[in-house]
């Protein structure tokens, strides 16, 4: 119902002004009447005066309380109901007078009359503005504006007896109306029961229960009666027991009631549900206050109910005056204790909650009218009670019809109900039932509800979503739809991204790079005055520095001449670097001048500091890094150990210069390195493989090379060999072209120089002490021994070293060729009592790092390693290096021996050679000669023997430098190992790619075999002549022939020469047109090679013949093998045979100086022939030649 100035706040907002004005006007008359009548505080007072009296009660006027007690004493004559009223009065006194009615609504105690006086005024305003004129006209004349004393005397009877009589008359009238309403509701209920009869057999039992309870006034869930506000005689109670008795007779006898208090059944509450719907609120509105007060544990265990307005609703319903309440049923307390069966809580979130909140608000408004006279209470609450009772009747019927399982007793057992089933049932019922007009009307009223009243409703709606989220069908469908269908696609994408570790090529013409400064060096005056001759003599003094290039700066002699900052000079002084070394004195000015540099110097000569100091100056000149910008200085190394050592050398300078460096290498967790790079770092020390991984990680968002302007390649010869050169060049291609690039190494073969110069621009080459020279401080010992005597000799060397007390803290490093040999030697030395460890590429990176740290710290004195530790390992106490297995080339020997004798210290390098390793003796002897040491006689014999074999063509001279075996071989080995693991621990997913590859390879072989069979069949179709091949085996053994030479002791008689020539001609004519496999028909003459082989290609398809004869493929083979390839003979169609004087069938002649070169060339030609045959077979299969029909 709409109210004028309606507000849910206790403060009189709507009518305060008018009420107070009328109260002041009538104040004198009111005091006079109160003096005339001692009962001046009775309820027949006008609303205006009562409103004024409330203010006085709050301040100092206390006679009101006495009159209230007197009024309650007057009620005590009623007997049983007076006890109820006494409890209500006590509750009122204990209630808080706070302004927050919402707090009162959610309060857990049942004391509800804290704002009695305010509620009087609120109810008074409500009744004044009510649209219900019918009830208003029936009120006493004391409600009118006429305040004459006669009306006051009439409205305020002097004795209780006439008032009680008037009350009885009105109750009789209300009973008649109630009976008429019950009949109307019974008819409506029967109609709805007939509509719900189609629900099936499960509802037939419920219909019986409904029919049984149809005669009871409690079936429609009317409001439980509350004690009337005025006293009454005991006479009407007898007739008011009948509805209760009827209700008890209609309800089935409880078979196993669950008692809470005396006879109160525990309501069934969904355990998992966090909220109650409006149906629960409607049903629980029937609970009397007595039942609630006797069962505090139930509501306290569900204290969140108060947040949804349910607790307040129960209290309010127990208090409010209704049409039934004013009837005064006799033992109404026992009636209150009887609980009705609760409906199943639905999971609706819309209309019903709003209705419940609004009805709760209405109930509270009705509560406020209790302080008035009984007539005013009844008139004000009648309309609300009728609406509420009708709505509760309909909702209870709806809830009962929705019950799937009938209850056999009147009580409700406390069982946990399945929420999902309840939700489904209630959804069906909501669809079946039409929208009730009263519900629609109350929904409209809910729009005008103040925010305080709707707060509980909003909270209820938020909570109510939880069961839907857990058990809703729609969410389940969504969860099923996501992720399942595309799982294979995601895995395929992930595998594809994982396999493709590639970085995009940058088009530098389209990128705008920031300008930067390279040149920081200003030549000091004393160096500028130095002549060229003086500079040359200075370089000669500094270990014979050799320079190549244009405008090479003169070498410096002091750190102060390098143009460094104060911080860098302080660090250098703190580290104890007195003066620059030879490579530093020449390299630092050259790099600081902005030039590209190739620096070659002996091991342990300070090359690392030579490129680090200019880099710090280079970085500090540029602006700081922004977020997600890559490094400025990039240092690449071939091994992880060298990367960690360079990073360690950087640290003293980083803190002083406020720079950051990241060491990125394989084997370590990449996530840590990604985190460091995202935080920002001006310097990155890395290995090429891990750097490519980082550049490709996360679609290139981890780091980039746009800010890189200073690049260092340490151990550059190893970086540019066959293994690392593709990776290094891929990284270099993504760096700006005008960068400054520096290359350093202790060894730099000539064949590596051409590759390195591709990455440099007009470089300055600085060589100190030779390209690949062992430092003169190292004593080199080379011994030729059998394999079984090497270990005994090793024990002897170690024993001699550690027998001297001066070498107690010495370290020994033993190099072997293979990882298995390292572990085997470790086992043998441990048995002999030497504490040692091994390090090689097969170990985890963390083990390698910890092993080197322990070795440097002296935890164990002996370290067994492969060549992975040959570069960059710097141990000051290392005095002995043993090459247990001889190094396979000069550079490796130099680096191995260079682990000792560092920074001016002395050391010893012992090398064991076996008779089978004479190939490696050449490089070792060369190293001994270049370092000024004598070559042992056994070693020299091995060198001479090997050189003779090379001249005879039996051996091939070993190439200088690290001729790496390439990354493809490593990838193949890793893939093979991974495939073995996958086959061993197969889960059904991993092996699919490998199986597909195997299938493809099998299909290719099958196609080739088919094509080859056609070639063989064509050859077999030809007439068989002597020497014609019956089949060609491209995968078979290659036959290489030595070229025939004239006998040394031939006769000088001309007739003999003529005879031999004639015989040769006849022999050749007899073989005309015939060429057996591997036998040439003409391979003589001055240009003939020492070895030759032939390959007939006449009967192969045209694509196959083209593959082995086109100029591009032949040129590649010629460059790779150094052989001569000639196409000879003539092509003959299948089935045609060359005549006696005709050329032989088309074939290829391969000539070379060594058998190995010819074999390699033949193998490559056979591979091309095989690929061409397969391609021809595929094209024939795709486009068959000829049609289906022939023209006759």
UniProtKB/Swiss-Prot annotation:
Biased composition (Polar residues): 400-410
GO molecular function, one term: RNA helicase activity
UniProt region (Disordered), positions on chain: 1-241, 315-416, 957-1003
Motif residue range(s): DEAD box: 714-717
Listed SMART domains: DEXDc, HELICc
Presence of the UniProt keyword Nucleotide-binding in the record: yes
Pfam family, one: KH_12
Compositionally skewed regions (Acidic residues) per UniProt: 360-377
Keyword annotations of the record: ATP-binding, Helicase, Hydrolase, mRNA processing, mRNA splicing, Nucleotide-binding, Nucleus
SUPFAM superfamilies in the cross-refs: P-loop containing nucleoside triphosphate hydrolases
Binding-site residues, ATP: 601-608
EC annotation from Swiss-Prot or TrEMBL: 3.6.4.13
GO BP of this protein: mRNA processing; RNA splicing
Catalysed transformations (reactions): ATP + H2O = ADP + phosphate + H(+)
InterPro entries named among the record's database cross-references: DEAD/DEAH_box_helicase_dom, Helicase_ATP-bd, Helicase_C-like, P-loop_NTPase, PRP5/DDX46/KHDC4_KH, RNA-helicase_DEAD-box_CS, RNA_helicase_DEAD_Q_motif
Cellular localisation: Nucleus
Chain segments annotated as transmembrane: none
Residues covered by the Helicase C-terminal domain: 793-943
Sequence ranges of Low complexity compositional bias: 8-20, 226-238
Motif window: Q motif: 557-585
Function text: ATP-dependent RNA helicase involved spliceosome assembly and in nuclear splicing. Catalyzes an ATP-dependent conformational change of U2 snRNP. Bridges U1 and U2 snRNPs and enables stable U2 snRNP association with intron RNA.
Free-text comment about domains: The Q motif is unique to and characteristic of the DEAD box family of RNA helicases and controls ATP binding and hydrolysis.
Family: Belongs to the DEAD box helicase family. DDX46/PRP5 subfamily.
PANTHER family, alphabetized: ATP-DEPENDENT RNA HELICASE DBP3
Full protein name: Pre-mRNA-processing ATP-dependent RNA helicase prp5
Species of provenance: Aspergillus clavatus (strain ATCC 1007 / CBS 513.65 / DSM 816 / NCTC 3887 / NRRL 1 / QM 1276 / 107)
């Amino acid at each position: 119902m709409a109210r004028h100035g309606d507000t849910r706040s206790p403060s009189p907002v709507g009518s305060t002004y008018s009420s107070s004005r009328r109260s002041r006007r009538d104040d004198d008359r009111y005091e006079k009447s109160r003096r005339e009548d001692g009962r001046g505080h009775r309820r027949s007072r006008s609303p205006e005066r009562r409103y004024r009296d409330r203010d006085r009660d709050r301040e100092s006027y206390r006679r009101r309380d006495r009159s209230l007690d007197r009024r309650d004493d007057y009620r005590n004559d009623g007997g049983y109901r007076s006890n109820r009223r006494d409890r209500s009065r006590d509750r009122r006194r204990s209630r808080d007078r706070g302004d927050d009615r919402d707090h009162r609504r959610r309060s857990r105690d049942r004391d509800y009359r804290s704002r009695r006086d305010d509620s009087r005024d609120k109810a008074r305003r409500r009744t004044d503005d009510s649209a219900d004129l019918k009830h208003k006209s029936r009120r006493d004349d004391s409600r009118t504006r006429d305040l004459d004393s006669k009306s006051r005397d009439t409205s305020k009877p002097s004795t209780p007896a006439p008032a009680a009589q008037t009350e009885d008359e009105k109750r009789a009238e209300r009973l008649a109306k109630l009976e008429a309403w019950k009949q109307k509701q019974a008819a409506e209920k029967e109609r709805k029961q007939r509509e719900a009869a189609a629900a099936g057999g499960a509802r037939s039992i419920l219909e019986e229960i409904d029919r049984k309870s149809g005669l009871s006034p409690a079936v429609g869930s009317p409001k439980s009666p509350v004690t009337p506000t005025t006293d009454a005689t005991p006479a009407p109670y007898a007739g008011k027991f009948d509805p209760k008795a009827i209700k008890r007779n209609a309800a089935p006898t409880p078979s196993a009631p669950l008692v809470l208090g005396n006879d109160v059944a525990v309501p069934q509450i969904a355990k998992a549900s966090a909220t109650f719907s409006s149906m629960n609120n409607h049903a629980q509105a029937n609970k009397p206050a007595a039942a609630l007060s006797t069962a505090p544990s139930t509501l306290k265990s569900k204290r969140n109910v108060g947040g949804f307005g349910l607790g307040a609703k129960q209290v309010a319903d127990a208090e409010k005056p209704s049409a039934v309440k004013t009837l005064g049923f006799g033992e109404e307390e026992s009636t209150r204790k009887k609980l009705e069966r609760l409906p199943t809580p639905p999971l609706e979130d819309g209309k019903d909650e709003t209705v419940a909140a609004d009805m709760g608000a209405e109930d509270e408004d009705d509560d406020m009218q209790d302080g008035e006279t009984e007539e005013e209470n009844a008139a004000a609450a009648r309309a609300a009670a009728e609406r509420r009772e009708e709505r509760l009747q309909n909702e209870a019927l709806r809830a009962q019809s929705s019950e799937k399982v009938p209850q056999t007793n009147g009580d409700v057992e406390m069982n946990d109900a399945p929420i999902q089933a309840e939700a489904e049932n209630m959804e069906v019922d909501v669809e079946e039932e039409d929208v009730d007009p009263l519900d629609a009307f109350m929904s409209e009223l809910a729009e005008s509800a103040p925010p305080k009243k709707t707060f509980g409703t909003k909270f209820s709606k938020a909570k109510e979503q939880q069961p839907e989220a857990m058990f809703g069908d729609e969410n389940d469908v969504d969860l099923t739809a996501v992720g399942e269908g595309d799982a294979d696609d995601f895995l395929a994408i992930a595998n594809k991204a994982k396999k493709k570790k590639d970085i995009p090529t940058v088009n530098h013409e389209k990128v705008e790079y920031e300008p930067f400064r390279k040149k920081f060096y200003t030549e000091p005056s004393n160096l500028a005055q130095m002549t060229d001759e003086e500079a040359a003599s200075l370089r000669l003094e500094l270990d014979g520095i050799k320079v190549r290039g244009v405008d090479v700066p003169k070498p410096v002699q002091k750190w102060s001449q390098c143009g460094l900052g104060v911080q860098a000079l302080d660090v250098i002084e703190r580290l104890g670097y007195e003066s620059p070394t030879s490579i530093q004195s020449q390299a630092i000015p050259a790099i600081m001048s902005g030039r590209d540099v190739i620096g070659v110097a002996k091991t342990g000569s300070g090359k690392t500091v030579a490129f680090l100091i200019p880099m710090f100056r280079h970085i500090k000149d540029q602006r700081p890094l922004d977020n997600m910008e890559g490094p400025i200085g990039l240092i690449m190394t071939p091994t992880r150990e060298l990367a960690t050592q360079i990073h360690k050398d950087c640290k003293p300078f980083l803190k002083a210069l406020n720079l950051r460096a990241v060491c990125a290498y394989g084997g370590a967790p990449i996530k840590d390195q990604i985190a460091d790079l995202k935080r920002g770092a001006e310097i990155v020390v890395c290995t090429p493989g891990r750097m490519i991984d980082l550049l490709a990680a996360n679609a290139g968002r981890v780091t980039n090379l746009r800010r890189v302007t200073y690049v260092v390649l340490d151990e550059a010869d190893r970086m540019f060999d066959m293994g690392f050169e593709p990776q290094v060049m891929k990284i270099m291609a993504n760096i700006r072209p005008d960068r400054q690039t520096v290359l350093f190494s202790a060894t730099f073969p000539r064949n590596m120089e051409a590759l390195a110069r591709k990455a440099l621009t007009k470089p300055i080459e600085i060589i100190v002490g030779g390209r690949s020279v062992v430092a003169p401080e190292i004593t080199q010992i080379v011994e030729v021994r059998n394999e079984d005597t090497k270990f005994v000799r090793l024990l002897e060397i170690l024993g001699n070293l550690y027998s001297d007390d001066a070498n107690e803290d010495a370290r020994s490093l033993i190099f072997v060729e293979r990882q298995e040999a390292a572990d085997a030697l470790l086992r043998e030395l441990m048995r002999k009592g030497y504490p040692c460890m091994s390090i090689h590429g097969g170990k985890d990176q963390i083990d390698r790092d910890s092993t080197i740290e322990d070795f440097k710290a002296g935890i164990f004195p002996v370290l067994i390693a492969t060549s992975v530790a040959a570069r960059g390992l710097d141990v000051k106490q290392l005095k002995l290096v043993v090459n247990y297995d001889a190094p396979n080339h000069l550079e490796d020997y130099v680096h191995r021996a260079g682990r000792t004798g560092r920074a001016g210290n002395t050391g010893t390098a012992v090398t064991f050679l076996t008779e089978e390793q004479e190939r490696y003796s050449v490089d070792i002897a060369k190293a001994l000669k270049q370092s000024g040491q004598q070559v042992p006689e056994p070693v020299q014999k091995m060198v001479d023997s090997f050189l003779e074999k090379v001249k005879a063509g039996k051996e091939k001279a070993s190439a200088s430098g690290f001729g790496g075996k390439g990354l493809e071989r490593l990838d193949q080995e890793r893939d093979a190992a991974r495939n073995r693991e996958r086959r061993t621990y197969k889960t059904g997913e991993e092996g699919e790619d490998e199986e597909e590859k195997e299938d493809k390879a099998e299909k290719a072989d099958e196609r080739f075999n088919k094509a080859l069979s056609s070639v063989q069949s064509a050859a077999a179709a030809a007439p068989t002549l002597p020497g014609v091949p019956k089949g060609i085996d491209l995968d078979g053994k290659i036959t290489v022939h030595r070229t025939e030479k004239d006998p040394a002791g031939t006769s000088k008689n001309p007739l003999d020469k003529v005879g031999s020539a004639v015989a040769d001609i006849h022999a050749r004519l007899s073989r005309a047109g015939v060429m057996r496999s591997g036998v040439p028909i003409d391979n003589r003459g001055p240009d003939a090679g020492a070895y030759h082989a032939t390959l007939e290609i006449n009967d192969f398809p045209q694509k196959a013949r083209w593959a082995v004869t086109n100029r591009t493929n032949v040129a590649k083979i010629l460059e790779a093998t150094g052989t001569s390839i000639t196409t000879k003979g003539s092509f003959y169609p299948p089935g045609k045979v060359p005549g006696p004087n005709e050329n032989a069938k088309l074939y290829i002649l391969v000539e070379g100086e060594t058998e190995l070169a010819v074999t390699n060339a033949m193998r490559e030609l056979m591979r091309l022939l095989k690929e061409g045959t397969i391609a021809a077979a595929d094209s024939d299969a795709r486009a068959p030649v000829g049609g289906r029909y022939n023209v006759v």
